[in-house]
Amino acid sequence: IYSRYPIHSVKALYYKNSSNMSLIADVRINNQYIRVINNHFETTSVNAYRGIITAPGKSLKIRAKAVKNLILQMKDNNRKRTIQADSIHAEIQRSPYPVIVCGDFNDTPASYTYHRVKKGLTDGFQDVGNGYQYTFRQLYRLWRIDYVFYSESLKGQNYFSPDVSYSDHNMVVWRGCVKN
């Protein structure tokens, strides 16, 4: 987490049986603290199997096995994201400060992950974004799986997700302020 404002404390939150994690930082802005929770939740694993499933010349048997393995992996990864979302929801509830919760959630707005973390917060895209915006650059650029959520005491001013190819995800840019 980079900030032009002083970072008072940082805590790393590691998830069991996962290489993913979240960072929690208390940032002092003027005379007020804001808790920033940056997340990287468990992947869908689609990219790991996509090459086998779509490669020309692969037999139907090999492709079918890859699809079956992908479905099993997606089920396991969804379970991991559920645990991660519950953990972050608990961190939000314990926070003595307004929160900004952001990052790669690897899940859609229809998911348990999205709704669990967003509960009681504002989705930056829904608040101040406009038009159609995706964050996952693959699978026909249909998916918004990276988010910025924030407490009611904060005010969104701008939100966008520029189409740049630094990653398989577009970055999310949100600008906001503390409400008067």
Residue ranges and their predicted role:
Residues 1-51, 160-164:
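Structured beta-strand-rich core segments of catalytic domains in phosphoester-bond hydrolases
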Residues 15-17, 73-87:
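Soluble or luminal CAZymes and related metallo-dependent hydrolases
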Residues 33, 58-60, 133-134, 180:
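Short, intrinsically disordered/low-complexity patches at protein termini
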Residues 50-74:
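A solvent-exposed, charged loop/short amphipathic helix patch at secondary-structure junctions
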Residues 82-83, 87-100, 105-180:
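Metal-dependent phosphoester-hydrolase catalytic domains
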